[in-house]
Regions:
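Sec/Tat-exported extracytoplasmic proteins
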Residues: 36, 40, 44-47, 51, ...
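Secondary-structure boundary elements
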Residues: 143-145, 150-193, 338-404, 465
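Extended, non-transmembrane interaction/recognition domains
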Residues: 196-198, 208, 212-214, 218-358
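Boundary of Sec targeting at the N-terminus
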Residues: 20-23
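Long, contiguous, compositionally biased segments that the model treats as domain-scale units
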Residues: 30-33, 37, 41-220
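Sec-dependent N-terminal signal peptides
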Residues: 4-14
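Active-site neighborhood of thiol-dependent amide/isopeptide-bond enzymes
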Residues: 200-213, 222, 384-438, 442-444
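Hydrophobic/aromatic-rich core segments of domains that either
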Residues: 224-253, 361-364, 411-489
Length: 489
C-alpha cells in the first residue's frame, strides 16, 4: 500500500512539474509574441510618422514624360484560306528559324503590409457598403472616419495622413486585404476596388478620395507617390510595366502613372515607404465577381460539327477586362501578348465550352485533337481588323474572344494557346512574325510539319488564322528570319 501511495505521489509531482514547465513556456511564448507585435506596430507607426514629416517638405516639381504610343506594327496579314486540295496531304518536317526568344514572365507574390496590421476590437461594428463591378463589398468605416481637407497644402495633407495612420483605420485596411483575397483580385483589380471604395465613401474624384485611396494602397504594401496640381491631389502608381498611351513621371528610376490625372506638371512628394512594391499587371486568376450573363452565342467548327458549344459570357468580367491597360516589360512590345495568354479562363466559361470539345477530341491522337481545336478557332469566329473595330490595336484575353463578335490573329492565337494547354496539357509558344501572330505546340507524340526547335524540343506550328490549315502549316510569306518566339506558362 505504501509503495502504491508513493508511486501516486511521484506521478502527481511529475504532473505538477510538467504543468509548471508548460505554463512557463506558454507565458514566455506569449510575452515574446506580444513583444514582436509591439515591435511591428512601432515600426509601422514610425514609418507613417516619418512619411507624414516628409509630406511637409519633400515635394519637387516634375514634368510628365510623353506617353508611349502603342507600337506601329507592320500592316496586319489578312486571314488566308488553306488550299482545300492540300487539306489531307502530309506536311513534311521543316525547321523554321527565329530571331529572338521572349522569356516567361513569372508571377510574384502580391505586396503585403510593411508590418501585420492588428485587428482593433470595437463595441459595435459599422460597415460602409459599396459595389465593385456590381459585386457587393463592405469595409469597417462609419461616419466618424470621414474627413475633409480644407485645402491641398503640404501641412494639411500631412495632418490628414497622421489621422489616417491612427489605429481607427486598421480594420478598414484589413477588410480591403480580405476582399483582395476573397475576390481573387490582381494588383490592377485591387487598385480599382480601392478607388471605387474611396470615391463612394468620400466623393468621386475629390482630394479626400485620392488621399484615402493612396493611404490604403500604400498600407497594403504598394509603391505610390502623391502629386499636387491646380489645387488637386493625385495618386501616382509605380508599375513594373510600361503602360501605353499614358503620360508618366520618372522618379528615382521608377515610372509612376497617374490615376485620373491629365496634368502635365505636378508637385510630387518623393517620400518612400519601407518595402513598397510596384504594381504588376499580370492577371494570374480571374476576379470573383457577381455573375451577369450576357446573351448566348453558338460556336461551331466547320470541319468538326460536333465541336459545338452554346456560351454566355459574364458581363461583369468582360467589363473588368475592358479596363485593363495595355503594357509591356523591358521595352519589348512582344511581352504584352503573354499577359493575356497566361490568364486562365473562368470556371464558368470552361463548364460551357470544354465538355463539347473534350467529347469531340476523346480517343483521338494529339495531332487529331489539336486539329479539332485549331479548326474550331479558325472557323467558329469572324475575323476583323482591330483598326476597323477598335480604332487601334486591342488584344483580347481568351474569354473576350468568346464574347465580342470579331477577333484577329493575336486573339485567335491567345485563345488557341489556352485551349491546347487546358485540354491537351501540352506546352505552347506564341510566334510573332511582322504583322502576324501564330502559335507552335510541343507535342509528345511524333507530329510532323513546320516546326521551331527550342531547348531540344520541337514545337510544331499551328496557325489559327490560316483558315482550314492543319497542324504543321505556316501561312505563306511569313518572315521567319524576323520571327520572335514568346514563351508561355
Amino acid at each position: 500500500m505504501k509503495k502504491v501511495l508513493g508511486i501516486c505521489v511521484l506521478c502527481v509531482s511529475v504532473s505538477l512539474s510538467t504543468n509548471a514547465q508548460n505554463n512557463e513556456f506558454e507565458n514566455a511564448y506569449n510575452a515574446f509574441r506580444q513583444q514582436a507585435i509591439k515591435e511591428y506596430e512601432d515600426f509601422r507607426e514610425k514609418a507613417n510618422k516619418e512619411y507624414a514629416d516628409f509630406m511637409r517638405q519633400a515635394w519637387k516639381s516634375y514634368q510628365s514624360l510623353p506617353e508611349i504610343p502603342k507600337p506601329k506594327d507592320e500592316p496586319p496579314v489578312p486571314p488566308t484560306p488553306y488550299p482545300k486540295d492540300d487539306k489531307d496531304k502530309p506536311i513534311k518536317d521543316t525547321p523554321k528559324p527565329y530571331e529572338e526568344v521572349i522569356p516567361i514572365t513569372e508571377p510574384e507574390p502580391q505586396p503585403k503590409p510593411v508590418a501585420p496590421i492588428r485587428e482593433q476590437s470595437q463595441p459595435e461594428e459599422n460597415y460602409f457598403r459599396f459595389t465593385f463591378f456590381q459585386t457587393g463589398c463592405k469595409v469597417r468605416l462609419d461616419e466618424s472616419h470621414r474627413f475633409t481637407l480644407k485645402d491641398c497644402q503640404m501641412n494639411t495633407l500631412a495632418e490628414a495622413w497622421e489621422r489616417l495612420a491612427g489605429n481607427e483605420y486598421n480594420n478598414a485596411i484589413r477588410d480591403c486585404l480580405e476582399l483582395r483575397i476573397h475576390h481573387r483580385l490582381c494588383d490592377w483589380g485591387y487598385l480599382l476596388m480601392l478607388q471605387e471604395l474611396s470615391d463612394a465613401y468620400l466623393g468621386r474624384e475629390t482630394n479626400e478620395s485620392a488621399l484615402l485611396c493612396a493611404y490604403l494602397y500604400c498600407q497594403s504594401g504598394y509603391q505610390m507617390r502623391l502629386g499636387m496640381g491646380n489645387n488637386r491631389l493625385y495618386l501616382l502608381v509605380a508599375s513594373k510595366h510600361q503602360i501605353y498611351e499614358s503620360g508618366y513621371w520618372e522618379i528615382d528610376g521608377m515610372f509612376y502613372y497617374p490615376f485620373n490625372c491629365q496634368e502635365q506638371s505636378l508637385e510630387i512628394c518623393g517620400a518612400s515607404f519601407p518595402n513598397e512594391q510596384p504594381l504588376s499587371l499580370l492577371v494570374n486568376e480571374n476576379p470573383l465577381l457577381v455573375e451577369k450573363p450576357t446573351g448566348s452565342r453558338v460556336l461551331q467548327a466547320e470541319y468538326f460539327p460536333d465541336a459545338r458549344a452554346n456560351v454566355t459570357s459574364d458581363e461583369n468580367l468582360i467589363s473588368f477586362f475592358a479596363t485593363y491597360p495595355t503594357s509591356m516589360l523591358d521595352d519589348n512590345f512582344c511581352t504584352r501578348w503573354s499577359f493575356y495568354a497566361n490568364t486562365p479562363m473562368s470556371e464558368r466559361i470552361k463548364k460551357q465550352l470544354y465538355p463539347s470539345l473534350q467529347k469531340t477530341i476523346q480517343g483521338k491522337s494529339q495531332y487529331e485533337a489539336a486539329n479539332v481545336l485549331l479548326n474550331f478557332v479558325q472557323t467558329a469566329f469572324v475575323y476583323e481588323y482591330d483598326d476597323k473595330v477598335w480604332g487601334g490595336d486591342r488584344a483580347f484575353f481568351a474569354e473576350e474572344s468568346l464574347y465580342y463578335p470579331y477577333c484577329d490573329c493575336e486573339d485567335r492565337s491567345i485563345l488557341f494557346s489556352r485551349l491546347v494547354r487546358d485540354l491537351l496539357g501540352l506546352k505552347v509558344l506564341l510566334v510573332y512574325y511582322p504583322g502576324h501572330l501564330a502559335t507552335a505546340v510541343c507535342f509528345t507524340d511524333n507530329v510532323t510539319g513546320d516546326y521551331i526547335s527550342l531547348n531540344n524540343q520541337k514545337y510544331v506550328v499551328c496557325d489559327p488564322t490560316y483558315i482550314g490549315a492543319p497542324v504543321g502549316a505556316t501561312m505563306p510569306d511569313m518572315d521567319n528570319g524576323k520571327a520572335k518566339v514568346i514563351l508561355l506558362q
